[in-house]
A protein has these predicted regions:
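Glycine-rich loops and low-complexity Gly/Arg-rich segments
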Residues: 26, 52-54, 78-81, 102-105, ...
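Active-site-proximal binding-pocket segments
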Residues: 160-306
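Trp/Phe/Arg-rich N-terminal binding region typifying the photolyase-homology
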Residues: 1-93, 195, 259, 305
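Soluble or luminal CAZymes and related metallo-dependent hydrolases
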Residues: 36, 131, 249, 253
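Glycine/tryptophan-enriched, flexible segments
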Residues: 16, 72-226
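An acidic- and aromatic-residue-enriched active-site/binding cleft used to recognize and process polar
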Residues: 32-34, 58-59, 83, 155, ...
């Protein structure tokens, strides 16, 4: 089923309309933690007075609120968050729930053709499988053969040492719980600092960003996490910004990274750090310009991580 609306706010009314047209009694959905999306979902539930609405935390392993300080506040530093997260996880690893059987519906066309009105990109989609079966196979292959060596290989962009699962995670093709279960099945010592633990850290970083965004909604509003950085006097230099975007700064690793981004829609994690740092600390260009450009190009674009 596909419905198109003119703007984000209209999505509430269209959900109400679809529910009415199909005599819906229960609505199940997955939580999104961005501030606008959370407000939308609250409004949907208020609008659907006669529909039972149930939300689920599918994009995290432990939901926001599960890992807090002794004062019941959100952690602001990763390492103590990670330690508390691991302690909480050892109490019981959340299970992956099997998908329910599909029930037929005469009013919903399973072969619906959808035309999306935005420019197509010329990226090589072979690197980013959209089928769940292919993503699961890629996950299994990495956990068997790559996760144990990730600590040694992750710092070298020329080496195929990362999982390349970020696009599947960003679009929901894979869940982080699937990643965790496969990792522990192949590398059971990962939870206790053994082989695979460094890649597990990456999953925890992903959790950290989402928990932060939930408890500090200003992060969704182009505000900095560290307050004093809002007083930095950024340079307005369209020439430098364009050179950075096009990979023409004259700094080889920065330029190679940005050209990789522009041609493939993806960039190695270390290169994301290098190019972002160069833009902000060397060119003194507002980080929001970089954030905007990354999100316009990344096939795995993710607001929390970005």
């Amino acid at each position: 089923m596909f419905r198109e609306v003119d703007d984000f706010a209209a999505s509430v009314e269209i959900v109400k309309q679809v529910c009415a047209e199909n005599s819906v009694t229960h609505l199940f959905y997955n939580y999104q933690y961005e501030v606008n999306e959370r407000a939308r979902d609250v409004q949907v539930e208020r609008t659907l007075r006669n529909v039972v609405c149930e939300g689920f935390d599918d994009s995290v392993i432990l939901p926001p609120g599960a890992v807090m300080t002794g004062n019941h506040e959100m952690y602001k530093v990763f390492t103590p968050f990670k330690n508390a997260w691991l302690k909480r996880l050892r109490e019981g690893v959340p299970e992956c729930v099997a998908a329910p059987k599909v029930r037929s519906s005469g009013s919903i066309d399973p072969a619906l053709s959808i035309t999306l009105n935005y420019p197509r990109q010329s990226f090589d989609t072979a690197h980013f499988p959209v089928e769940e079966k292919a993503a699961i196979a890629q996950l299994r292959q990495f956990c068997q053969n790559g996760a144990g060596e990730y600590e040694q290989q992750r710092d070298f962009p020329a080496v195929e040492g990362t999982s390349r699962l970020s696009a599947s995670l960003a679009t929901g093709g894979l869940s982080p719980r699937q990643c965790l279960h496969r990792l522990l099945a192949e590398q059971p010592q990962a939870l206790d600092g053994g082989a695979g633990s460094v890649w597990l850290n990456e999953l925890i970083w992903r959790e950290f960003y989402r928990h932060l965004m939930t408890y500090y909604p200003s992060l969704c509003k182009h505000r900095p996490f560290i307050a004093w950085t809002d007083r930095v006097q950024w340079q307005s230099n369209p020439t430098y910004l364009k050179a950075w975007q096009e990979g023409k700064t004259g700094y080889p690793i920065v330029d190679a990274a940005m050209r990789q981004l522009n041609s493939t829609g993806w960039m190695h994690n270390r290169l994301r750090m290098i190019t972002a740092s160069f833009l902000v600390k060397d060119l003194l260009i507002d980080w929001r310009e970089g954030e905007r450009y990354f999100m316009s190009q990344l096939i795995d674009g993710d607001l929390a991580a970005n």
